[in-house]
């Protein structure tokens, strides 16, 4: 049955136009006048944890969380069991997606077998079914291995999406090697452990012509390297997360919900990421939604597993923290959270929309999340842009908590 919303601000051709009515299928949500209808959000970096770790999250709960945050397409990372390094292993995940996903899910195949960095995965067999290839959770340590992966990905027309981390520079660190780590006796992770591999890979991407994407950029030097590579014609894009744009190591608390990889960096790094988002060096925002069990996140900064959740609060926190403060236009936020990721990874997002009430206020409450994960550094934040509904392929999926 067709329904409609009246008096909406509709995103069209890069700007907002006023529409008297907006039609869709499903039960109409209860909303105020002048809500904003934007293209469905797209997240190219999500951990759905299934198969292998369904005590943390499932495809069903993860995509429900995505829909509750306005997302209509996500790309799932390959650190699973089995690792999708052959078509047979990938099919295990594809079958679950077909059965349980509420929205579009495009998985990544792994770059190397078992994400061990030793031999290439069966990329040819997986190519028709994946968004690209990544060893996310681990960096490809071997330059030779990454070179071979890029050559093969180039021939297949696929993106290499790289988790950039030099294991030789970690030294057991788990938060940023900055003032907080020094003051509180924590082991730090250097910025070079990220930007070093990025510099290496940018050279390889220039040589091979491979479409190269950098995951979860967190340092100022990384942004500068990518900016210069773009100017020289390298086919590179990158993402950063909401937490890197809005928080830094000065915001750390002795709580597992502040622990992720890469870690929250310095204020200068945060500011450089915002500048990169403004000038287009940082192409897109991805949450790196990485749920863990409550027990796994209850061991403080030193003992908790790395990873936070973000699908259900990303748009409100970024709207409040960047748009309302004048750092980014609403149109640019839509570009970074929907259009750019869909364009880079060839994602069909037609007839998919997210509806937000920009004036509605809410407090981020993880206990109300659809996700099985609860660990977010944004818990308790007072934000605007409450989610009203998500329309997937023309039909309303999720009304939102204020409907």
Predicted regions: what they are:
Residues 120-285:
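Histidine/acidic residue-rich metal-binding segments in metalloenzymes
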Residues 44-57, 78-80, 106-119, 137, ...:
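Active-site mouth loops of central-metabolism enzymes
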Residues 35-100:
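Metal-associated gating/positioning segment near the N- to mid-region
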Residues 8, 300-303, 351-403:
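C-terminal cap of metal-dependent C-N hydrolases
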Residues 8, 21, 34, 45, ...:
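Divalent metal-coordination and catalytic microenvironments
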Residues 183-209, 278-279, 283-285, 290-356:
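His/Asp/Glu-enriched, well-ordered alpha-helical/loop segment
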Residues 95-111:
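A glycine-rich helix N-cap at a beta->alpha junction
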Residues 1-30, 35:
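N-terminal metal-binding scaffold of metallo-dependent hydrolase/deaminase domains
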């Amino acid at each position: 049955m067709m329904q409609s919303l009246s008096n909406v601000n509709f995103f069209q051709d890069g700007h907002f136009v006023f529409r008297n009515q907006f039609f869709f299928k499903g039960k109409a949500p209860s909303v105020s006048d002048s809500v904003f209808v934007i293209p469905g959000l797209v997240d190219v970096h999500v951990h759905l944890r299934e198969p292998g770790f369904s005590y943390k999250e499932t495809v069903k709960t993860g995509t429900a969380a995505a829909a509750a945050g306005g997302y209509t397409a996500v790309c799932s990372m390959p650190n699973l069991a089995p690792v999708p390094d052959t078509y047979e292993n990938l099919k295990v995940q594809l079958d679950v997606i077909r059965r349980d996903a509420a929205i579009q899910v495009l998985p990544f195949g792994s770059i190397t077998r078992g994400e061990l960095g030793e031999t290439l995965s069966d990329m040819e067999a997986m190519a028709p079914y994946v968004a690209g290839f990544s060893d996310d959770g681990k960096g490809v340590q071997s330059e030779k291995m990454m070179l071979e992966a890029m050559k093969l990905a180039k021939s297949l027309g696929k993106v290499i999406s790289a988790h950039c981390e030099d294991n030789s520079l970690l030294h057991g660190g788990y938060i940023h090697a900055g003032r907080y780590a020094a003051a509180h006796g924590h082991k730090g992770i250097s910025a070079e452990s990220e930007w070093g591999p990025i510099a290496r890979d940018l050279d390889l991407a220039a040589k091979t012509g491979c479409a190269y994407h950098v995951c979860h950029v967190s340092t100022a030097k990384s942004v500068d390297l990518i900016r210069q590579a773009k100017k020289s014609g390298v086919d590179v894009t990158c993402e950063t997360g909401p937490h890197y744009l809005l928080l830094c190591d000065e915001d750390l608390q002795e709580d597992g919900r502040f622990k992720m990889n890469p870690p929250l960096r310095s204020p200068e790094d945060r500011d450089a990421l915002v500048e990169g988002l403004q000038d287009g060096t940082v192409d897109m925002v991805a949450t790196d939604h990485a749920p863990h069990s409550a027990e796994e996140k209850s061991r403080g900064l030193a003992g908790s597993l790395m990873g936070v959740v973000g699908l259900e609060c990303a748009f409100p926190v970024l709207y409040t923290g960047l748009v309302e403060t004048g750092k980014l236009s609403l149109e640019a936020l839509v570009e970074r959270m929907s259009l750019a990721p869909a364009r880079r990874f060839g994602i069909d997002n037609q007839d998919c929309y997210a509806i937000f009430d920009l004036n509605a206020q809410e407090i981020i409450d993880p206990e109300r999340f659809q996700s099985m994960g609860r660990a977010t550094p944004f818990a308790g934040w007072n934000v605007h842009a409450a989610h009203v509904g998500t329309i997937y392929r023309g039909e309303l999926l999720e009304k939102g908590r204020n409907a």
